[in-house]
């Protein structure tokens, strides 16, 4: 295991819901605020994060833009993922 890496956090990103949750955490948005940005109810957003349902294609790019990640990363886990506060990595 890489020092400082949370294995649970890495395995949680293996699903669309896990990536949505991780990106929201990195964005420091509440579940309610994230849902409002995308135009859905909080229980819908929660279902997405917990893999009880998946957002339709019409929401994926809006979610990605709201959470400042790429649509590719959100869908597949590859590409530009979340940036945490204080992350000074240059792209």
Residue ranges and their predicted role:
Residues 1-26:
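A short, Lys/Arg-rich alpha-helix, primarily the initiator
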Residues 4, 39, 56-73:
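DNA major-groove recognition helix of helix-turn-helix/homeodomain DNA-binding modules
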Residues 5-6, 12, 80-91:
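Interfacial/linker helices and their anchor residues that mediate assembly or domain coupling
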Residues 18, 28-29, 55-58:
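Residue-level signal for the short linker/turn that defines the boundary of a DNA-recognition helix
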Residues 26-50, 66:
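Short alpha-helical DNA-recognition segment
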Residues 41, 52, 78-81:
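The DNA-recognition helices of helix-turn-helix-type DNA-binding domains
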Residues 68-85:
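Short C-terminal boundary/hinge segments that cap the last helix of small helical domains
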């Amino acid at each position: 295991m890489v020092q400082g890496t949370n294995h649970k956090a890495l395995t949680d990103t293996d699903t669309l819901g896990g990536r949505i949750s991780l990106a929201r955490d990195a964005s420091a948005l509440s579940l309610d605020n994230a849902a409002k940005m995308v135009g859905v109810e909080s229980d819908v957003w929660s279902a997405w994060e917990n893999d009880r349902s998946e957002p339709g294609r019409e929401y994926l790019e809006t979610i990605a833009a709201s959470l400042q990640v790429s649509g590719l990363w959100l869908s597949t886990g590859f590409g530009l993922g979340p940036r945490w506060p204080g992350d000074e990595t240059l792209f």
